[in-house]
Curated annotation (Swiss-Prot):
Keywords: Cobalamin biosynthesis, Glutamine amidotransferase. It holds the Pfam family GATase_3. Catalyzes amidations at positions B, D, E, and G on adenosylcobyrinic A,C-diamide. NH(2) groups are provided by glutamine, and one molecule of ATP is hydrogenolyzed for each amidation. PROSITE patterns: GATASE_COBBQ (PS51274). Belongs to the CobB/CobQ family. CobQ subfamily. This is Cobyric acid synthase. The active site is at C329, H427. It comes from the Bacteria. Pathway: Cofactor biosynthesis; adenosylcobalamin biosynthesis. Residues 248-435 form the GATase cobBQ-type domain. The keyword Manganese does not apply. InterPro entries: Class_I_gatase-like, CobQ/CobB/MinD/ParA_Nub-bd_dom, CobQ_GATase1, CobQ_N, CobQ_synth, GATase_3, P-loop_NTPase. It comes from Pseudomonas fluorescens (strain SBW25).
Amino acid sequence: MSTLMVQGTTSDAGKSTLVTALCRWLIRQGVAVAPFKPQNMALNSAVTAEGGEIGRAQAVQAQAANLAPHTDMNPVLLKPNSDTGSQVIIHGRAVTSMNAVAYHDYKAIAMQAVLASHARLSEAYPVVMVEGAGSPAEINLRANDIANMGFAEAVDCPVLLIADINRGGVFAHLVGTLELLSPTEQARVKGFIINRFRGDIALLQPGLDWLEARTGKPVVGVLPYVMDLHLEAEDGIDRRQIDKAAQVLKVVVPVLPRISNHTDFDPLRLHPQVDLQFVGPGQPIPAADLIILPGSKSVRSDLAYLRANGWETAVARHLRYGGKVLGICGGLQMLGEQVHDPLGLEGPAGSSDGLGLLAFSTTLEEEKQLRNVRGRLLLEDAQVSGYEIHAGVTTGDGLSNAAVLLDDGRSDGAQSADGQILGTYLHGLFETAAACSALLRWAGLEDVQAVDYHALRERDIERLADLVENHLDTELLRELCGI
């Protein structure tokens, strides 16, 4: 069994994308492969079939490997709930919340979970394709590292180092990162990959020759900048949009400090009839057809932030003029009358007034609800699938007019009597073409084009595998993967 690890010189260097590409490339070679990320810090997460929580990037990588997502693919997930602390999720389950200093001491325990998951995957698959986190050259984080070289040393695996040339300084990034590694760690780096290159490769070649001579390590390949590649972002919000049709629906999403699962909006960003705008701090909410209140890892503090930016008033004005409002998960909770956090799960214990737009209240409880679901969106009786990730238990008369009827017999969410407001706990509801079309019609778009988001993602995964085949040294990759 072989393990190959991809590490990056910086965050967003292309690690997630490269692991996705390599997984599909190996599948094309007839080799079963499992993706793996020892430790992930992200507010975008997915739910596995067994009801665990992992990073969404690993769920996409699982799709590339033709596998169902599993908690062993991301044994440690950190979900920030403040500027200095995170909820710690081990093997898909939240075990505690702690600040960065406490977590540094906790890493020895987390490493046990990491190695156990890797061992299980190694027994089940010929190749385990590993994604590092951030950069291996973060000197302050070297002690007790479980995400990069600490893991590579523990399992004795080779490493490829990827850097983003589009940011500039690619040779400094690669050489500097290598110089900051220990001799044994340097020996693990078997080659470099340069990502997002634009222009004539002949102009880059002298630099590649210098890099190989300077380090004694090969350049495995240069990946081109791909303009219209749209895979789910792991961290930052992807604001790119495709060209839009003449008739568009204007959708606005206020960006909250603890926004979670903003990948919910990727299908809208890619829809030819939707003009999706993210509104940041200090910006007014512009005229729109639909305002969506997103998920949040800290609902009460994000409610306070929403009010401080004047967005509560903007939502009320939007409704007076006939606009539609949709709340997803934490956004659903904000639509109600009260949000109670008696245990201090998302910050200081206490209660906050909601927006008071729907007649229910929410209490945060220790046991998190994690499940993949299917059902019918009661708008047009449209089929919908999605996933629940929430600690809130919502009760009240407003739930009698549900938004979704689930196949397991439960109802979900609520609608206002006048039909202007809808809330649901379901993440990913726009990924189902029928539900997306129904929601866009509800928001005011008359002639809706159906878009198959899953087919778009599959197309992009195939394109990534083409890039591996056409731009990387596949013989060296075969050698490193032991195939």
